[in-house]
């Protein structure tokens, strides 16, 4: 049987079919949406879901446990240093060594004739001849080291006062030298045996027992004392003072040692002294009396001392002043040499013996570097009247024609005058 459909029926069926199809599609879409969009709001279910998610995150991000024997983690790369960071740290500038200087002053022969003591006894009632040196006290005090050659042995009054040719001075002389401020006293000279061995022993003992701060050099009681390098220290600078004599007027055997001018001994001592001190000064009694110019032997000995490293040479014995020169040693070193300082004080009877030389030297040390940085040649005059009275030493700068007119020297030497002395000063002073 066949079914016949008219147009109206077909149209209704078609519309119903479309509605059913649209409903089916919408149902599928809604079912596929998340719960939140589907209106799911149950609180317990939301919290459970959140806790589950948090636990999952913790499991993924938890750091693995490390053990002590595992390899260390590599350091993270650092930023390259900036230009400022690569500059070296500023350092403190090196401190310059401080220069230390000391001044030395040296006088010639302290030649004490008996008349000087007799006059002082008559005026003052004792042998303490302080007034003879009163005018040079400031000169002595101005130096860090003051040196004098004690030409006459200080054997003490018990051995008696003696004049030329065998001198002896009372202990008061040592007292005065200490009072003036002398630091170094040289004793090796041709008059050292004038009072025999006992005179030498007395002199050594008196200085040692009363003035141990004074360096006595040139004579010794034992070989052990002789073996020690005599050194005087001022402001941390050490100066060795070696003292020798060409000979002596008389000799007496005994337990004393006098330094003789033996070249082997001198050079060996200089070498040892250079190891022990900063500077080496050789005080040598040499030359010819009353000779105004050094002789060839003095020149040769001075050059030898320079070759072995002496820094300063101070000569005595001629009783008159001689030249000052600077020598060059074999190693290129410099040596300052005063060939003769003449007399500090005396009652000799010639004009040149009344003028004494004064060595003025500056030693400087900067770290290990050492040098003589300044030197000069000054002068003093021994003043006394016709009776040898009022004997005193006067600095040349204070000497006047009036003082020269009062001097007793014209009674013995008619050439004496202020102008004569001035001519000698002009000849030898450093230009």
Residue ranges and their predicted role:
Residues 8:
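Polyanion-binding surface elements
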Residues 65-84:
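Extracytoplasmic/periplasmic/luminal assembly and interaction segments
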Residues 60:
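Glycine-rich, pocket-lining loop/helix-strand segments that form or immediately flank
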Residues 2-3, 11-40, 49-51, 55-56, ...:
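Acidic, metal/ion-coordinating pockets
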């Amino acid at each position: 049987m066949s079914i016949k459909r008219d147009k109206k029926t077909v149209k209704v069926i078609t519309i119903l079919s479309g509605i059913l199809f649209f409903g089916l599609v919408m149902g599928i879409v809604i079912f596929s949406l998340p719960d939140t969009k589907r209106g799911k709001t149950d609180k317990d279910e939301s919290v459970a879901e959140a806790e589950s998610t948090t636990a999952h995150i913790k499991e993924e991000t938890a750091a693995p446990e490390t053990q002590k024997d595992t390899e260390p983690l590599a350091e993270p790369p650092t930023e390259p240093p900036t230009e400022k960071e690569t500059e070296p740290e500023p350092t403190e500038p090196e401190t310059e060594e401080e220069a230390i200087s000391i001044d030395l002053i040296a006088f010639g022969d302290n030649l004490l004739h008996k008349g000087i003591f007799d006059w002082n006894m008559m005026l003052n009632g004792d042998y303490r001849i302080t007034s003879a040196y009163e005018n040079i006290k400031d000169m002595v005090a101005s130096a860090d080291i003051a040196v004098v050659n004690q030409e006459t042995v200080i054997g003490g009054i018990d051995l008696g006062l003696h004049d030329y040719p065998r001198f002896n001075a009372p202990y008061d002389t040592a007292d005065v030298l200490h009072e003036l401020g002398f630091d170094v006293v040289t004793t090796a000279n041709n008059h050292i045996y004038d009072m025999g061995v006992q005179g030498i022993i007395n002199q050594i003992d008196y200085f040692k027992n009363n003035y141990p701060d004074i360096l006595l050099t040139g004579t010794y009681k034992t070989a052990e004392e002789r073996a020690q390098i005599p050194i005087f220290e001022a402001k941390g600078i050490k100066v060795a003072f070696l003292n020798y004599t060409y000979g002596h007027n008389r000799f007496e055997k005994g337990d004393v040692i006098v330094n003789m001018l033996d070249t082997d001994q001198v050079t060996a001592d200089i070498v040892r002294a250079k190891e022990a001190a900063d500077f080496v000064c050789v005080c040598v009694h040499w030359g010819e009396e009353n000779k105004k110019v050094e002789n060839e032997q003095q020149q040769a000995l001075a050059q030898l001392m320079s070759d072995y490293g002496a820094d300063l040479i101070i000569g005595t014995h001629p009783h008159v002043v001689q030249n000052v020169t600077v020598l060059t040693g074999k190693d290129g070193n410099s040596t300052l040499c005063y060939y003769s300082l003449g007399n500090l004080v005396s009652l000799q009877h010639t004009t040149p013996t009344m003028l004494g030389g004064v060595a003025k030297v500056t030693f400087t040390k900067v770290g290990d570097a050492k040098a003589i940085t300044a030197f000069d040649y000054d002068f003093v005059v021994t003043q006394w009247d016709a009776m040898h009275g009022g004997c005193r030493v006067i600095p040349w700068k204070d000497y006047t024609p009036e003082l020269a007119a009062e001097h007793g020297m014209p009674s013995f030497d008619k050439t004496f005058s202020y102008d004569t002395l001035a001519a000698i000063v002009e000849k030898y002073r450093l230009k």
